[in-house]
Design a protein with these regions (language model features):
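Short acidic, glycine/serine/threonine-rich loops at helix termini
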Residues: 17-24, 68-70, 105-110, 140-144, ...
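Short, glycine- and charge-enriched coil/turn segments that flank and shape catalytic ligand pockets
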Residues: 2-3, 48, 87-88, 110, ...
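Glycine-rich phosphate/ribose-binding loops and adjacent secondary-structure elements
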Residues: 77-81, 88-96, 101-143, 149-150
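Short glycine- and Lys/Arg-enriched binding-loop motifs that mark or flank ligand-binding interfaces
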Residues: 22, 29, 52, 58, ...
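Glycine-rich beta-alpha junction loops
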Residues: 11-15, 61-65, 99-103, 135-137, ...
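Charged (often Lys/Glu-rich) extended helix/loop segments that serve as interaction or gating elements
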Residues: 119, 126-279
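Conserved active-site and cofactor/substrate-binding residues in soluble primary-metabolism enzymes
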Residues: 34-37, 41, 69, 73-76, ...
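Active-site-proximal beta-alpha core segment in soluble small-molecule metabolic enzymes
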Residues: 1-94, 103, 119
Length: 279
């Protein structure tokens, strides 16, 4: 075929992103990438091959990062490897710095993206820079709307049991992450209390928010904010719950872009085991 395949190597720069450990991907203890010495050896072997062309160096140190320092530390370690490659006459055309820029879920101070990119381009000079933004683009473009089904109070806790659950938005259960919970109609005449907003799934990890001061009554709608990233894509059919629909809004226009699943759709790809007894 005489094809020449372009290659990039994902390097693990061993940098602590100071984020939740489940979404840290740039430490030596994480499963991603190879260390700089291994990468150097890989590049040398690739440079000797007639079927491979070295074109880039990649890294990604994690997600929901709210400080610029880890990004710069990772960049500088990557550029050290680029210089070593130059000394071996191996030229890297692009540097893929991944994504990871965090957003504000709970009034966190976040990175100024312009300052971050200026820091990158000032250091990387004439290299082509690839960036993989995700959360920083879509997180605040989505909200999860859920309805209060029941209010339940005991001597210790007050629960707002809603129709949404951990299968719909698992981030609070998986990462103990914080999402703002906003009452859509702020004229509710219900009960004011500090509510745990919980779903109907059969485990205590099923919560969307805890200890939120709201005035609620049955039938109220609550908006769980900043749900556009790692929301629907992490949803499941746990407890045989059909996934929710998605509605896109633009100005005063709205359109159903993903219809609600049905109980029937949960089983449409299943079939009986054909062992001769169910003929």
């Amino acid at each position: 075929m005489n094809a020449v395949a372009p290659i990039s190597v994902r390097v693990n720069p061993n940098v602590d992103a100071n984020t939740h450990p489940y979404i840290s991907t740039g430490l030596a203890e994480n499963k991603f990438g190879v260390d700089a010495d291994v990468a150097l050896s890989m590049y040398k072997k690739a440079a000797l091959s007639d079927s491979l062309k070295v074109c880039g160096l990649d890294y990604h140190i994690g997600s929901q990062i709210t400080e610029i320092a880890p990004f710069i530390e990772a960049l500088e370690r990557a550029l050290e490897l680029v210089e070593k490659l130059k000394s071996e006459n191996i030229l890297v055309e692009h540097l893929d710095i991944g994504g990871g820029v965090g957003v504000s879920y709970d009034d966190e101070k976040i990175i100024n993206i312009e300052d971050y990119l200026n820091s990158v381009t000032n250091r990387a000079k004439e290299m082509k820079i690839l960036v993989e933004p995700g959360r920083s683009i879509v997180a605040n473009a989505g909200i999860f709307v859920t309805r209060v089904e029941y209010l339940k109070r005991n001597n210790l806790k007050s629960f707002a049991i809603v129709d949404g659950a951990m299968n719909d938005l698992i981030r609070p259960s998986l990462y103990e992450s914080f999402h703002q919970a906003v009452l859509i109609d702020d004229n509710s005449i219900g009960i004011n209390d500090n509510w745990d907003i919980v779903g109907p799934v059969c485990e205590s990890a099923d919560f969307l928010a805890k200890n939120r001061n709201l005035t609620l009554e049955k039938g109220d709608y609550i908006a769980i904010m900043t749900a556009g990233a790692y929301g629907f894509v992490l949803s499941s059919n746990y407890n045989s719950r059909p996934r929710v629909p998605e509605v896109m809004i633009s100005g005063k226009q709205h359109s159903l872009v993903r219809k609600r699943e049905t109980i029937e759709s949960l089983f449409e790809n299943e079939s009986l085991f054909e062992d001769g007894t169910n003929q």
